[in-house]
Amino acid sequence: MHFEDEEEIGAVTNGTKGITYVSSDEYTAEVSDDGIVTAGVIGTADITVSDGHNTKTCKVTVTPRYNYFVDPYFGFGQTEAQVRAKVTTGTLVELDEALGYSYSSGSSLYLYIYEFEDGKLAAVGLLFKVISPYSTNYANYLLERYLLVGENEGMYGFLNKERTVFAGFNPSNTSDGVYITAFMPYEGSARSSLPNFIESINSVNPRFLRHLEKLNLK
């Protein structure tokens, strides 16, 4: 299954009790009282079906439609040397208090920038040109992988399923013709602190942009 796909579990019972459906992970696969499964973020989930006497389990696997990018490394708090050891793909460019990695897909490039504060990884930025193949269905790319938690002043906030990483993306902010998605470590309640996280995202985005000339994003 893919994000937002629906499938019905064809369960029947000879008993007098109704059938119940329970998902082991509702972020990946949500199931209705009628047995309709709706796919969420990528991953696997078990749907337990029971009529009170017999119980069966079926596995749901949600896979991505869009594989535009190599997954970023979220080793927040780690040193530059530790990040270098973990990120083994892309072309490395050493930056001022940051590491840049460029990747190509056809004639288009995208970048990951790993920003450090006091020698520790503090933020990760994904950058690509607005006019590029990556722009098509990019929102769905994010929704396949992250939970949308809200919007504030045009910035959309996302969390990973483990609730350890916050992401911010503003589709109307196209500074220098570039889209930026910033990732930062997450702690606390996303809804109550969304404006604070958006403020943090807005403060870190210019730091990503200052590296563009050296990284030569085309």
Label every PLM stretch briefly:
Residues 78-218:
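A cross-family detector of function-defining hotspots
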